[in-house]
Curated annotation (Swiss-Prot):
It comes from Photorhabdus laumondii subsp. laumondii (strain DSM 15139 / CIP 105565 / TT01) (Photorhabdus luminescens subsp. laumondii). GO terms for molecular function: deoxyribonuclease IV (phage-T4-induced) activity; DNA binding; DNA-(apurinic or apyrimidinic site) endonuclease activity; phosphoric diester hydrolase activity; zinc ion binding. HAMAP family: Nfo. InterPro entries: AP_endonuc_2, AP_endonuc_F2_Zn_BS, Xyl_isomerase-like_sf, Xyl_isomerase-like_TIM-brl. Zn(2+) 3 binds at H182, D229, H231. CDD domains: AP2Ec. This is Probable endonuclease 4. Its EC number is 3.1.21.2. Binds 3 Zn(2+) ions. Zn(2+) 2 binds at E145, D179, H216, E261. Disulfide bonds: none annotated. It is an enzyme of class 3 (hydrolase). Belongs to the AP endonuclease 2 family. NCBIfam families: nfo, PRK01060.1-4.
Length: 280
């Protein structure tokens, strides 16, 4: 079974995000559990936590149908110790918020070397950051998102994801989220069924589908292998609709949240409905 949704607003409280997802006829959703552009946020109030859980139960969202995203400020591979510690503490807080809400997944961008440390050292530092967070929390899986490779961001090669996973002690609590726009921009072609198969065979060989915990379904304004992260609506960009139909028909993508981050929220209901139709 496919779980399809979008990254919805949590304005007015995280409990409101659940209602917005339901209004889209989504069977999965993503959200920020705090302001994604600030380091600090108030603790989640007990009544808001209760309402979030009640709404999830009412509308049928299980703990692995929700894929929250952490703050954009966090860099778990930061080359400077003070900034790294700040990121690690913020990431632990994000994991704890998921724990409180009964969510089993936390999606994050792995980190950036900022041209101050080599790639392997940065990847090892990211894995160490994940280990620290997992040791201070329970149940929540750290879900590494592939990146487009813009700037000094790591995670744009499947080998980067595999190296991070290799350094994580508890393999049961680490996974990956594949963003189609990021993959395309990083040089993994998705424009035909044949190249989709080749790309996902590569993924299976290097990372493994057992680690796939979610996907971001986005077309791309950016060019193939451009290392530029620019999302577009499904079928409107340089990828086209083929891979999204491919994903919806392939059982390897069952049982995980498939999340739209496309640029026009007004057409999310139509995009979700179209994706669901592709299963037939």
């Amino acid at each position: 079974m496919k779980f399809v949704g979008a990254h919805v607003s949590a304005a007015g409280g995280v409990d409101q995000a659940v209602i917005r997802a339901h209004e889209l006829k989504a069977t999965a959703f993503a959200l920020f559990t705090k302001n994604q552009r600030q380091w600090h946020a108030p603790h989640l109030a007990a009544d808001v936590i209760d309402k979030f859980k009640e709404n999830c139960e009412r509308y049928g969202y299980g703990s692995r149908q929700i894929l929250p995203h952490d703050s954009y400020l966090i860099n778990l591979g930061h080359p400077e110790s003070e900034a790294l510690e700040k990121s690690r503490l913020a990431f632990i807080d994000e994991m704890q918020r998921c724990e409180q809400l009964g969510i089993d997944l936390l999606n994050f961008h792995p980190g950036s070397h900022l041209n101050k440390v080599d790639v392997d050292k940065c990847l090892a530092r990211i894995a160490e950051s994940i280990n620290i967070a997992l040791n201070k929390t329970q149940r929540v899986t750290a879900v590494i998102e592939n990146t487009a490779g813009q700037g000094t961001n790591l995670g744009f090669k499947f080998e980067h994801l595999a190296a991070i996973i290799d350094g994580v002690e508890d393999k049961n609590r680490v996974g990956v989220c594949i963003d189609t726009c990021h993959a395309f921009a990083a040089g993994y072609d998705l424009r035909t069924n044949d190249v989709c198969e080749q790309t996902f065979q590569q993924f299976e060989k290097i990372v493994g589908f057992q680690y796939l915990c979610g996907m971001h379904l986005n077309d791309a304004k950016s060019e193939f292998a451009s290392r530029v992260d620019r999302h577009h609506s499904l079928g409107e960009g340089n990828i086209g609709k083929t891979p999204f139909s491919y994903i919806m028909k392939d059982a390897r993508f069952d049982g995980i949240p498939l999340i739209l981050e496309t640029i026009n929220p007004d057409i999310w209901p139509q995009e979700i409905a179209w994706l669901k139709l592709q299963q037939n």
